[in-house]
From Swiss-Prot:
Classification lineage: Eukaryota, Metazoa, Cnidaria, Anthozoa, Hexacorallia
Tissue: Component of the acid-insoluble and acid-soluble organic matrix of the aragonitic skeleton (at protein level).
Bias (Polar residues) ranges: 103-112
Highest taxon above the source species: Eukaryota
Chief site of localization: secreted
Cell location: Secreted
Keywords (A to Z) from UniProt: Secreted
Name of the featured protein: Secreted acidic protein 2
Gene Ontology cellular component list: extracellular region
Length: 165
């Protein structure tokens, strides 16, 4: 085989053709490769989409952490308030305490129930106080009206007696 020039594709033609198809379009092929490079840039865009997905999953993990902290904080509040309820109630048995409530959900339910009954008790206190005030006003009104009736009756009796004479 003898080749003339710097032809490396062994097809017998001369020139700087390297793509084995006989024509001299290596510049165009390089442009096509550049286009595929642009497609590689599109692949980089898909890589950016993957990065966005990983960022979102990172945000999801961050969203879970405060919820866990908040749950622990709320359990602590429920435990402390159940201690207060047991100390405040003088009639409760000493054996009933935090040891009796192994499950935090039971302590939370009991705490919410005691809060509900505390609200009912305070409403009942307000209503009974209002009822007592109403009873006082009725009794005061009865005293005034009975006094007024007695005054009118005695005045009429005096007038009647004076007219007889």
């Amino acid at each position: 085989w003898s080749x003339s020039g710097d032809d490396d594709d062994d097809d017998g033609d001369s020139g700087d053709d390297d793509d084995d198809d006989g024509d001299d379009d290596s510049d165009d092929d390089n442009d096509a490769d550049d286009d595929s490079g642009a497609e590689d840039d599109n692949d980089d865009d898909s890589g950016d989409e993957n990065e966005d997905d990983t960022d979102d999953s990172g945000d999801d993990v961050k969203m879970i952490k405060p919820t866990t902290v908040m749950t622990g904080w709320m359990m602590t509040i429920a435990d402390e308030s159940s201690d207060d309820d047991n100390e405040r109630d003088d009639t409760s048995d000493d054996s009933v305490g935090d040891d009796a409530y192994n499950d935090d959900s039971q302590a939370g339910e009991l705490n919410s129930d005691s809060t509900y009954y505390d609200q009912l008790r305070s409403q009942g206190d307000v209503q009974s106080q209002q009822g007592f005030k109403n009873l006082q006003s009725y009794s005061n009104g009865f005293k005034v009206s009975s006094g007024l009736v007695a005054t009118v009756v005695s005045t009429l009796a005096c007038l009647f007696l004076t007219n007889l004479h």
